[in-house]
């Protein structure tokens, strides 16, 4: 028996594994393990082998958000959900810190230097994640046959490819290494040195990633990038700190709103196709924030009740802003609330000071910030971040360069010093400066809301009305729009009793915000067209006129100019000059502080500011000569689009120029202050002194060159051909100039040195004009296509 049992056991040991397993469950084999040779189990039987994903995330520092960000030592990885593949993303690149050389040029923290829309695609064949630059497709009705062509005809470029390092366990996320796009190696989504006009590349071993953060709908990388710039035999290293964000755009774009030439909004153009067309055209959507009532308030809103928006606009004031100015900036931002109430929304725009107790991360691109930059640049700027598909403003940054305060201070003194005793000091009181800071902030926020400059705002107020205490108090401004370059009331004379001297929100601003932000509850832009037309038809008064900015030296419409006030340029400028004549004898007194060792630098600064103001007045008047009134017309409104400036006004303009600049303005250039200081001017090589007579010669030369420019002369010739004797002609212009400039010589007299200088300027201008090409296209368009950022003039 024993032998048979042992034979059976040995036979079982020789069976296959499956047979052994079946046999092993019988009671007879429970204690036979001593027959087996003991082997150490392989490690993989104790623990499953780790996947590429598990190996990658093991030991990583991980941040959760739109993408999970994994950091292993100096390597950074994005874990990208496959649900986001194909979604539209916006890359937003900003400067965070810059060297002194760039800072002095106004390239500072917060400047947005490059944006582009992208999407991601998984190329499974190559094992790569592709970045494709997305360009909004042209518009076309889905029911039209041409819609298929729009979908099939256009392709956007691939700009970057990433090896897929790992896929998570359930294949819902891909992992890519992103060092190259943030350390300067790859420039497809961040090309800072090209965009700030250095045209160089980052040096890899001198560039690095500082951090990457992930938020709910965006991820931001902060990098320190270094380049080498060579000029001649000199090499300079330039390091900048930049942030590069990838922002998830709304899955459903905001409904666009059509632009109208009667209202000044920045626009987002999209090509438009349809079967009914016999050509192509562009649809222009205005740029604006998504401002909608809450779902539960929509019925009340449409009945005319004022409600709170579902999402208000919030601006954060940078904690580097000097304390004494913060309240004024806050007021300037929130001044727009009255305009939003006209559009049916209360508490629609809010300003908050950033404090240490706030849980606000300024690296999150969702936050709109007023950034205060320690810079010599004299300006402020209000750019916006747009969804290119719809024109929706997603975020806005107000750039505030510190030295704008010096320019504002000069305006206050030069434009209001004769009627405001507090303006006659080197160091102005905080409340006076604060009022000016408030209007600058308000103007810049207007840009951040989508509004363009409206240079017709100042013309809306009659010149003489700006001397009325009653009118100025009622209108509470110097113009109908804060978006004009209308500064302080230089027209008011001592004794007029005018108290309101600065610009504020006006009728045009409220009208423009209502056009852009009133919610109609419609589903398509086309459904709003009639409602918007009806709204515009109720606002035809001069208070609601709009006109773009023009070239200062060749303005076509004299009503729409920079730095002007009133509707009569000659009278406004004469009143302004009367005030300047009162200021010049007081320059030394107003700029003397009593400080031991004080120089005449402040006197020189104020003297130069007075001359600049005088020069502004000259060009306000010059625009009348050869000028054309240009209206934004529609068929059937009974208004002419183009009307030449009246002959009498052009004659008065020439008389003004002959009396005020094409002569020797002794009151301005033969002064006591000129005995103590020359005019100081900042140049790229430092401060430069200029003799007053040199400044006068330059002013006369520019006026004569611009009077005799071909564009102006061709407009005058056209006027004469259309209106005959009712026109102010080129012959009359030349005759007036010749008689005035050479009058002494023709009468047999001997011209003095200043008269000879003017005669030479006139001859130079004639030679310059004669050298211009004869064929000139008559320019009736006021301005070229707009730029979202203003560079040429302050604000």
What are these regions (language model features)?
Residues 79, 111, 280, 319, ...:
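Soluble non-cytosolic domains of exported or imported proteins
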Residues 381, 386, 392-397, 441-449, ...:
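Extended catalytic-interface subdomain
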Residues 15-22:
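C-terminal segment of classical bacterial N-terminal signal peptides
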Residues 458-795:
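Conserved catalytic/binding loops enriched for acidic/polar residues
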Residues 334-345, 446-447, 451, 488, ...:
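Sec-exported extracytoplasmic/periplasmic mature domains
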Residues 1-6:
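Bacterial N-terminal signal peptides that target proteins for export
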Residues 32-35, 48, 353-373, 435-492:
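The catalytic-center signature of Zn2+-dependent metalloproteases
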Residues 27-77, 81-321, 339, 348, ...:
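Auxiliary tRNA-acceptor-end handling modules of aminoacyl-tRNA synthetases
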């Amino acid at each position: 028996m024993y032998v048979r049992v042992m034979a059976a056991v040995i036979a079982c040991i020789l069976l296959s594994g499956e047979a052994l397993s079946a046999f092993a469950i019988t009671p007879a084999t429970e204690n036979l393990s001593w027959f087996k040779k003991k082997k150490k189990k392989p490690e993989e039987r104790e623990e499953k082998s780790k996947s590429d994903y598990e190996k990658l995330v093991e030991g990583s520092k991980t941040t959760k958000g739109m993408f999970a960000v994994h950091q292993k030592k100096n390597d950074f990885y994005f874990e990208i959900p496959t649900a986001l593949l194909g979604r539209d993303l916006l890359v937003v690149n900003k400067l965070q810190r810059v060297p002194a050389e760039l800072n002095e040029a106004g390239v500072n923290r917060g400047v947005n230097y490059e944006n582009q829309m992208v999407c991601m695609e998984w190329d499974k064949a190559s094992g790569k994640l592709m970045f494709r630059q997305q360009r909004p497709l042209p518009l076309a009705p889905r029911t039209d046959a041409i819609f298929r062509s729009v979908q099939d005809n256009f392709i956007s470029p691939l700009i970057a490819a990433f090896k897929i390092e790992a896929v998570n366990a359930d294949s819902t996320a891909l992992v890519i290494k992103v060092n190259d796009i943030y350390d300067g190696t790859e420039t497809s989504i961040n090309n800072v040195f090209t965009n700030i006009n250095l045209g160089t590349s980052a040096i890899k071993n001198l560039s690095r990633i500082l951090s990457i953060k992930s938020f709910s709908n965006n991820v931001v990388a902060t990098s320190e990038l270094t380049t080498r710039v060579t000029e001649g035999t000199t090499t300079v290293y330039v390091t900048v700190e930049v942030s590069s964000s990838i922002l998830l755009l709304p899955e459903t774009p905001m409904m666009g709103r059509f632009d109208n030439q009667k209202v000044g909004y920045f626009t987002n153009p999209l090509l438009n196709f349809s079967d009914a067309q016999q050509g192509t055209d562009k649809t222009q959507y205005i740029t604006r924030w998504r401002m909608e009532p809450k779902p539960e308030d929509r019925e009340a809103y449409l009945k005319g009740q004022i409600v709170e928006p579902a999402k208000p606009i919030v601006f954060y004031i940078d904690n580097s802003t000097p304390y004494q100015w913060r309240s004024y900036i806050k007021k300037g931002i929130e001044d727009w609330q009255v305009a939003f109430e006209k559009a049916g929304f209360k508490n629609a725009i809010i300003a908050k000071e950033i404090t240490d107790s706030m849980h606000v991360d300024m690296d999150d691109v969702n936050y709109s910030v007023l950034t205060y930059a320690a810079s010599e640049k004299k300006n402020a700027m209000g750019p916006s971040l747009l969804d290119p598909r719809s024109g929706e403003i997603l975020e806005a940054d107000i750039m505030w360069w510190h030295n704008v305060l010096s320019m504002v201070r000069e305006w206050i003194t030069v434009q209001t010093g004769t009627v405001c005793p507090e303006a006659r000091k080197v160091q102005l009181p905080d409340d006076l400066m604060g009022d000016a800071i408030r209007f600058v902030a308000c103007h810049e926020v207007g840009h951040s809301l989508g509004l363009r400059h409206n240079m017709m705002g100042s013309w809306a107020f009659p010149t003489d009305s700006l001397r009325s205490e009653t009118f100025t108090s009622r209108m509470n401004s110097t113009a109908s729009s804060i978006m004009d370059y209308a500064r302080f009331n230089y027209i008011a004379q001592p004794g007029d009793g005018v108290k309101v001297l600065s610009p504020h929100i006006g009728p045009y601003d409220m009208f423009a915000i209502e056009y852009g932000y009133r919610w109609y509850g419609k589903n398509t832009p086309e459904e709003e067209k009639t409602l918007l037309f009806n709204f515009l038809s109720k606002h035809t008064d001069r208070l609601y006129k709009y006109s773009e900015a023009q070239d200062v030296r060749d303005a076509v419409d004299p009503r729409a100019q920079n730095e002007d006030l009133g509707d009569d340029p000659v009278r406004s400028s004469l009143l302004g000059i009367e005030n300047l004549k009162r200021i010049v004898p007081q320059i030394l007194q107003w700029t003397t502080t009593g400080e031991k060792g004080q120089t005449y630098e402040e006197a020189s600064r104020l003297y130069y500011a007075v001359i600049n103001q005088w020069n502004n007045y000259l060009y306000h008047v010059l625009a009348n000569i050869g000028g054309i009134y240009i209206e934004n017309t529609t068929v059937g409104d009974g208004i002419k689009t183009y009307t030449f400036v009246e002959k009498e006004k052009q004659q008065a303009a020439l008389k003004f120029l002959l009396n005020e600049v094409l002569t020797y303005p002794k009151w301005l250039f033969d002064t006591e202050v000129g005995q103590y200081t020359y005019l100081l001017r900042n140049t790229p090589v430092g401060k430069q002194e200029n003799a007053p007579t040199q400044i006068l010669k330059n002013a006369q030369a520019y006026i004569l060159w611009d009077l005799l420019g071909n564009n102006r002369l061709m407009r005058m010739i056209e006027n004469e051909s259309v209106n005959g004797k009712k026109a102010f002609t080129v012959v009359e212009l030349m005759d007036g100039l010749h008689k005035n400039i050479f009058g002494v010589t023709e009468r047999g007299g001997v011209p003095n040195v200043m008269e000879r200088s003017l005669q030479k300027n006139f001859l130079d201008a004639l030679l310059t004009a004669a050298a211009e090409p004869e064929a000139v296209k008559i320019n009736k368009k006021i301005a070229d296509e707009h730029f979202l950022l203003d560079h040429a003039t302050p604000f």
